[in-house]
Amino acid sequence: MPREIVGKVLRFSLRHAPCAHICRYCLISESRKRSPLPFSRFEQLVHRFYDWKQSQQRDDLEIGVFVGPSFDYDIETLKGVARLRERRGGKFQILNLGGLRIRSGDELAAWLEERRVAGIVGFHASLAGYGEIHDRWNGRAGDFDYQTSILRLAGERGMIRQEKLFLAQNTLRKH
């Protein structure tokens, strides 16, 4: 006798913003490849499923969205991710710093200001140790200093700063 299958969760994922490095602890493999699907089409698809969920009165259905693997979005993508988060009843206000390409000076200040104007109120950094230890785990020299400099600049602008520090015994060989 056939059984009815009722889905409870839909997850949509788009590799839109390539990662500038590959962390040794990351679960997303080969994250430098970018999907050929434009973000605007991805957003339309997800909105159609939200509309379907509403029309079918499927309050029991959870729709999850991930656009990554880094949050190095252009402003239009950032606004689109915010629209998708609003459909879930949330706000997209904190930007994760992992995997961003390195910017400096006026370019970094302008990048930060563009995000502040677009509604980002703070930044989050996941740090795998201090200084060179973090850099080794993340596969990019200077990454620890880069992420902490963005947090400092954000704090100077009155923005929220969030840090997560991973504590573990270092098992990486010295290079």
Language-model segments: residues:
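Catalytic cores of alpha/beta
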Residues: 169-175
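Secondary-structure boundary elements
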Residues: 153-160
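Canonical Radical SAM [4Fe-4S] cluster-binding loop centered on the CxxxCxxC motif
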Residues: 1-44
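Amphipathic, alpha-helical segments enriched in basic
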Residues: 1, 17, 24, 109, ...
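Generic structural signal for well-ordered alpha-helices
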Residues: 46-50, 78-82, 108-113, 148-152, ...
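Core AdoMet radical
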Residues: 9, 30-40, 55-73, 85-107, ...
